[in-house]
Amino acid sequence: AKKPSVEAVFHAYLLSLPGIKFVGHTHATTVNQILCSPRAQDFAVHRMFPDEIVCCSVASVFVPYTDPGLKLAQTIRSQTEAFVRKYQRQPRGILMKNHGIITLGATWQSLLSAKLMAEKAAKVFVGAAQLGGPEFFTEENIARIAGRPDEAYRQRALKM
């Protein structure tokens, strides 16, 4: 019989979070281009455009490189708990340095929307880097956009 993935522990933990029913883990090419660069944490904790905030939330959890297995699950847990304390919400994305992306949500649509938007944001980030670097939103702009009623309506329409 096949053995379960060494990453099963972090999947189980994430599925135990309030409101989380779906967890997806991929190694999206453009996202990994950034995660394998010195700009990985910048990409995780900053936002560049409104759709990124709507689909990927105000920031993503950033996990420094950790070997897969129990240690990675423990690091994901501690970084996720710190995110929840800081932002008072569950994350929609977890970006793992030199590894990949985890998206999570209450519906499969929210998981897919976050994954696709993270890949779009990665393409924008890489393109902006070629033109002198990305221009990030301020925390005030992020908070304002995240709190707009029309953006909340869009999230409901996207089943987020």
Segment roles from a protein language model:
Residues 1-160:
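Glycine-rich flexible loops
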